[in-house]
């Protein structure tokens, strides 16, 4: 079932002029792209497909922590690329509260993965 679905998606992405233009932009390392319109799991599918043509780190920014977690889970299902959630700090800078040790560790782990040069997909909430 997944193979048939994947073949149809590959056909769509290979014949879509809009996708080819978007991929050309995405392959430029200095380019920032804002994608709006796709809903549900199509957005992570599109992001995973675009990232598959790039040999660099990609940053996906979401409005909320929950949406970041959903996008991360979807990306892990749609792509073979490494996907990492860079969690929200949990406090505002002016609050003076410290984040938990596990949260700090999760963030440091993502930062250490970035240092390896792996073409990672990092998902982070605002």
Question: Which residues does each PLM region occupy?
Answer:
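ASCE RecA-like P-loop NTPase motor cores
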Residues: 1-126
